[in-house]
Amino acid sequence: MTPKRVGLYNPAFEHDSCGVAMVVDMHGRRSRDIVDKAITALLNLEHRGAQGAEPRSGDGAGILIQVPDEFLREAVDFELPAPGSYATGIAFLPQSSKDAAAACAAVQKIAEAEGLQVLGWRSVPTDDSSLGALSRDAMPTFRQVFLAGASGMALERRCYVVRKRAEHELGTKGPGQDGPGRETVYFPSLSGQTLVYKGMLTTPQLKAFYLDLQDERLTSALGIVHSRFSTNTFPSWPLAHPFRRIAHNGEINTVTGNENWMRAREALIKTDIFGSAADVEKLFPICTPGASDTARFDEVLELLHLGGRSLAHAVLMMIPEAWERHESMDPARRAFYQYHASLMEPWDGPASMTFTDGTVVGAVLDRNGLRPSRIWVTDDGLVVMASEAGVLDLHPSTVVRRMRLQPGRMFLVDTAQGRIVSDEEIKADLAAEHPYQEWLDNGLVPLDELPEGKDVRMPHHRIVMRQLAFGYTYEELNLLVAPMARLGAEPIGSMGTDTPVAVLSQRPRMLYDYFHQLFAQVTNPPLDAIREEVVTSLQGTTGGERDLLNPDQNSCHQIVLPQPILRNHELAKLVSLDPNDKVNGRPHGLRSKVIRCLYRVSEGGAGLAAALEEVRGAAAAAIADGARIIILSDRESDEEMAPIPSLLAVAGVHHHLVRERTRTQVGLVVESGDAREVHHMAALVGFGAAAINPYLVFESIEDMLDRGVIEGIDRTAALNNYIKAAGKGVLKVMSKMGISTLASYTGAQLFQAVGISEQVLDEYFTGLTCPTGGITLDDIAADVAARHRLAYLDRPDERAHRELEVGGEYQWRREGEYHLFNPETVFKLQHSTRTGQYKIFKEYTRLVDDQSERMASLRGLLKFRTGVRPPVPLDEVEPASEIVKRFSTGAMSYGSISAEAHETLAIAMNRLGARSNCGEGGEDVKRFDRDPNGDWRRSAIKQVASARFGVTSHYLTNCTDLQIKMAQGAKPGEGGQLPGHKVYPWVAEVRHSTPGVGLISPPPHHDIYSIEDLAQLIHDLKNANPSARVHVKLVSENGVGTVAAGVSKAHADVVLISGHDGGTGATPLTSMKHAGAPWELGLAETQQTLLLNGLRDRIVVQVDGQLKTGRDVMIATLLGAEEFGFATAPLVVAGCIMMRVCHLDTCPVGVATQNPLLRERFTGKPEFVENFFMFIAEEVREYLAQLGFRTVNEAVGQAGALDTTLARAHWKAHKLDLAPVLHEPESAFMNQDLYCSSRQDHGLDKALDQQLIVMSREALDSGKPVRFSTTIGNVNRTVGTMLGHELTKAYGGQGLPDGTIDITFDGSAGNSFGAFVPKGITLRVYGDANDYVGKGLSGGRIVVRPSDDAPQDYVAEDNIIGGNVILFGATSGEVYLRGVVGERFAVRNSGAHAVVEGVGDHGCEYMTGGRVVILGRTGRNFAAGMSGGVAYVYDPDGELPANLNSEMVELETLDEDDADWLHGTIQVHVDATDSAVGQRILSDWSGQQRHFVKVMPRDYKRVLQAIALAERDGVDVDKAIMAAAHG
């Protein structure tokens, strides 16, 4: 049974992902063969599922088939009516036979009430002998019901009502919900068309468990199968897929908001299609509370489909393609999407969504193309779609088409018509169903076409008074607002945050500060809002919705907002809306209502609560009175009336109207004085606002212009710049959570509350939780009152001269916010470690640890309970020399910091036997060998981040640990960045990039879009270095514990929990402050969740984030960590003085700079760093002795040794309840250790490479060439990588001569074929390949070509040969692919050469080197972020310019050198693959070469020109490059 919410564990945070496949006979011919093939496909996807602590209890597997009428007639002892005239479904019932019988009787009563007859029940034959104890203990009773009384869609609708009533009335509940009747009745399906068998099973167990699936009489014309990978191990049979209509590979990121909006829409649904008009109420709530994201998607899809739409129509409403910026889209299709956007927001997130109603079967891919889906069609009408190629052994001679599902595209098989229906036909037919464009023209009201409103200017002293009342500081205006107005972009900062979270601050804080942005990590990816802007949208509408099931021309009667930030005059348009005002010659008919959000400040929290009730009541009254837009305004605050915090007002009204089920009848707009940062705007939208007018920030910008604070720009441009920066910032916040459209983000409330009471959250931010509790309305009112007093002084004559407070959030200021690192602590730390004086070090730690006055961190609220165990003598405690081996330095890249600083840390850690982390910038190979004096500059931990800078086979081989950086504490959900002025030639060489050209790491790893993708990369890295531990770095947030459980199940050796306050070399300032959570919360949740899952003893837990003292380490140990990372502190020890200018390359002490002159100022030494870590270890020993522990392992997870009494001394923090942080869970796995005591099974002994290594032994030992052939299947993953590791170990980075090891494979290569393969290895596949071919290619050669047995008329250049994300992070080598490949080909390629015959969207993204030849079409957004290398595209039809992202590249014609190189390369491709298109081009070279277009990055071209000029003039090339880089 799934545990209920306990401690910090919350079942609502569970995630899953999976493998999915469908097998269908296009002509609708039922056969046993289809069922067998579907089950075989499922077995070949087993590696995409998972098991937990008990291997025989799987995460879930299932199959959906057509109702097997002939089989069922023989299986039951009662007569069945004609096919299609009865429905059936397997019911999951209580285990007790008495309760099961009662449930059956209740279902029968409901069915009869709905006009259906229960024909009978059947006991479903099962065999549970293969199940593990967890699955068996949670196993329900299985009964199959048969219903009659209608046919066709009428039967489907009645069954739907019966099932929904059974769920609502008989107590089906979601995971972890309390109360009797949990999962009393659950129907995987109840239909006359389809039947689902599923459960908490492994893929091999499905057929073994359900004996029906072994019966040869059971037939179908289609089968959809699914293998589940969950982040937990708690069995829940209903959570397995398929669901009633769908099977899903991916995750819906916006599901909370989608469910809230669906709940609000229910009141508008008026239909008699399910019986009488009153019957529709029986269906509500449509979404089962607590159900999985996929289950809720399926429930809404059912409603839309059974409510009258075709299944394809319903799917496209929920997962529309990216139409907003698609300029070449057919206008009718665009109108279809725009119209439906007014009915429903997208269900956004990675999705390969397979669907069926039993006749049509199809799939759709999300707009970003984030899940793999491959399709095969055979000559006898068999159609297969799966997450991978090779799930079925189809003879190549029978396969006539090989396709892929493309972003936003739909694939559909209609078995009634016996054909594949094209995406174009589906959408053209749907677009023609109604006059959508006409409805839009008559209904939508563009904002800029409304009558103009007035904009009032305020004098300076009134603006200052308002700024004080709303908590503005000088720092905010100068560091945040002014740069946004000047530059149109968020300002950048560095070094992370070391100030208290809002609930611990002694200062009044904005309510926004108590909400931290959530972000995607592992279970779904963040999106790239910069390079993939083409699939994003900030456009929205406001003005209310209509009945979802009865659309007409009135359904889109709304105002169109191009983005959510309204200028003052634009808000005035909405305020003064007159229904009789005409737009396009017609009265628009829309009304607005302004509601004042103020309260009498003298009445405190009680007055605030009363005012909120008044505001909510006024909103409800306004809706009843016909208002379609409500404007929540705090503009008229004065001496007596204080503003209600805008976030509280918006969220409070939003949730009140959701509960009233009137929310969708009105749009919410905020006229806000307190919103000025990007985070503020994002929070307001995230909690329900359609638009924001931050009037005071506009007035502040105008005031700064008037006073000359902002210069060189006029008023209009400054305001436009601010709006542009804010909009881009909101888009980035959305993209952190993997959301593409503002409509999906609105109301999704993707935030974590830190330090807010459950009472406030339940009432005003419903759905959010904060296990520790926190501030109440009284405290919020106290913060407002403190600001209000500053604005309205007792003497009115003083008010005009009042100045803003300094701030001090981002930079230390004497009168500002408290910083853990301040001049005094920096001095003490450096003095103690440079002089080796432990006594002075203790003075430093006392300053940091002394929380009696400054409770600056959550750990500051904790104290040690020294009486729990008797103390032990210090000499009996584990020595410092052993403890220090648990320490590592945080990941700091070479490039962000200087070589001197980087190597100082490495030398010190290697001397101690500890570990340094090289960060994401690669490492100079010269450091891999020891220095003559015995020192070692090699970093023990090599990081693998999203850009894969410098990640080669040689790099991966030279380490003890490999760390996958999923997120960074200072900026989770974002990529890294290294400005061009810091990319000196020596940095570029290590990163395999171009000197002087700025580098940006993509926000996602493009090979990790889900938990099973992470498992694949862990497997890749373990193959690349079998002796290295593989780490996964996560950032603390709600739910990180369940992600960590998934990481453990994915076989990582170490999971790192980073705090939100980690350091960075460069990040937007708002990210630094408002994303992620304290590590104390994430670490405690991780420990508790791993224990509950029985996974704690198989994985090491590490923590980092502003660790500064032995006390910090001891508290982290007691909360569950056994290893510890330090970054800022050792950097300070090495000389950093916290100037926070790392991103500018101006570090005055030579730490965070590449400037040779500044680097000369570096004074750090390894000995200083050694002293620091030994001092920390000694302090830890002292604490261990006091607490009665002899070793660190004894102390790990012993949270009972901590107490929370210190929290009572803080005016806000005394309301925190830290008991959940210290909770010690009871687990079903009681024998497990609280620390890692066993090893993960990586399954390397089963790898195909073990055979390849044996067969290649002569080459590995002596360099003698070997050549051989073998077969390969999709289950053979990461082939060639371990072989490459052995070659690299023997021969280093130079490898062997090309082709020394030459292997030919026949079949379908599994994921990551040829990953990191070094020079000397050639791999050929006759067949096809999956995703990630040539990932990190390090000099090897890969050829993929169709099988020689392919049909004679097979046109390779029209068919798929490889998957997505091919050549990701390749640094050298060659790849030749005869055919078309998927999305993101050559992403981050930095040196490899490749030829391919067509690519999907986002080709050559972030490419920094190498050359790519494309002998076919490209998808959209080609060359986005491409800063180096060259692409040659064969473009006879002139389509490339329309698909090109021209921000960083330009198109050129070939010169003579280009033509010669291209001819030779195509010839090599033809020789390797027998390419027909290549041969056609070569045979008419003089005529065809003019059709090639050269794609050239501008910065790369500029650097090449600088090099050429320098060489011509005989000047220093490096200086010339950097001169060009610096402008």
Curated annotation (Swiss-Prot):
<dbReference type="Pfam" id="PF01645">
    <property type="entry name" value="Glu_synthase"/>
</dbReference>
<comment type="pathway">
    <text>Amino-acid biosynthesis; L-glutamate biosynthesis via GLT pathway; L-glutamate from 2-oxoglutarate and L-glutamine (NADP(+) route): step 1/1.</text>
</comment>
<dbReference type="InterPro" id="IPR036485">
    <property type="entry name" value="Glu_synth_asu_C_sf"/>
</dbReference>
<keyword id="KW-0408">Iron</keyword>
<feature type="active site" description="For GATase activity">
    <location>
        <position position="18"/>
    </location>
</feature>
<keyword id="KW-0314">Glutamate biosynthesis</keyword>
<comment type="similarity">
    <text>Belongs to the glutamate synthase family.</text>
</comment>
<keyword id="KW-0003">3Fe-4S</keyword>
<dbReference type="Pfam" id="PF00310">
    <property type="entry name" value="GATase_2"/>
</dbReference>
<dbReference type="InterPro" id="IPR029055">
    <property type="entry name" value="Ntn_hydrolases_N"/>
</dbReference>
<feature type="domain" description="Glutamine amidotransferase type-2">
    <location>
        <begin position="18"/>
        <end position="416"/>
    </location>
</feature>
<keyword id="KW-0315">Glutamine amidotransferase</keyword>
<keyword id="KW-0479">Metal-binding</keyword>
<dbReference type="InterPro" id="IPR050711">
    <property type="entry name" value="ET-N_metabolism_enzyme"/>
</dbReference>
<dbReference type="GO" id="GO:0015930">
    <property type="term" value="F:glutamate synthase activity"/>
</dbReference>
<dbReference type="GO" id="GO:0005829">
    <property type="term" value="C:cytosol"/>
</dbReference>
<comment type="subunit">
    <text>Interacts with unphosphorylated GarA.</text>
</comment>
<dbReference type="GO" id="GO:0005886">
    <property type="term" value="C:plasma membrane"/>
</dbReference>
<keyword id="KW-0028">Amino-acid biosynthesis</keyword>
<dbReference type="GO" id="GO:0051538">
    <property type="term" value="F:3 iron, 4 sulfur cluster binding"/>
</dbReference>
<dbReference type="GO" id="GO:0046872">
    <property type="term" value="F:metal ion binding"/>
</dbReference>
<feature type="binding site">
    <location>
        <position position="1136"/>
    </location>
    <ligand>
        <name>[3Fe-4S] cluster</name>
    </ligand>
</feature>
<feature type="binding site">
    <location>
        <begin position="1083"/>
        <end position="1135"/>
    </location>
    <ligand>
        <name>FMN</name>
    </ligand>
</feature>
<keyword id="KW-0288">FMN</keyword>
<keyword id="KW-0521">NADP</keyword>
<keyword id="KW-0285">Flavoprotein</keyword>
<dbReference type="InterPro" id="IPR017932">
    <property type="entry name" value="GATase_2_dom"/>
</dbReference>
<protein>
    <recommendedName>
        <fullName>Glutamate synthase [NADPH] large chain</fullName>
        <ecNumber>1.4.1.13</ecNumber>
    </recommendedName>
</protein>
<dbReference type="InterPro" id="IPR013785">
    <property type="entry name" value="Aldolase_TIM"/>
</dbReference>
<dbReference type="InterPro" id="IPR002489">
    <property type="entry name" value="Glu_synth_asu_C"/>
</dbReference>
<keyword id="KW-0560">Oxidoreductase</keyword>
<dbReference type="GO" id="GO:0006537">
    <property type="term" value="P:glutamate biosynthetic process"/>
</dbReference>
<keyword id="KW-0274">FAD</keyword>
<feature type="binding site">
    <location>
        <position position="1142"/>
    </location>
    <ligand>
        <name>[3Fe-4S] cluster</name>
    </ligand>
</feature>
<dbReference type="InterPro" id="IPR006982">
    <property type="entry name" value="Glu_synth_centr_N"/>
</dbReference>
<dbReference type="GO" id="GO:0019676">
    <property type="term" value="P:ammonia assimilation cycle"/>
</dbReference>
<feature type="binding site">
    <location>
        <position position="1147"/>
    </location>
    <ligand>
        <name>[3Fe-4S] cluster</name>
    </ligand>
</feature>
<dbReference type="GO" id="GO:0004355">
    <property type="term" value="F:glutamate synthase (NADPH) activity"/>
</dbReference>
<dbReference type="Pfam" id="PF04898">
    <property type="entry name" value="Glu_syn_central"/>
</dbReference>
<dbReference type="InterPro" id="IPR002932">
    <property type="entry name" value="Glu_synthdom"/>
</dbReference>
<dbReference type="GO" id="GO:0097054">
    <property type="term" value="P:L-glutamate biosynthetic process"/>
</dbReference>
<keyword id="KW-0411">Iron-sulfur</keyword>
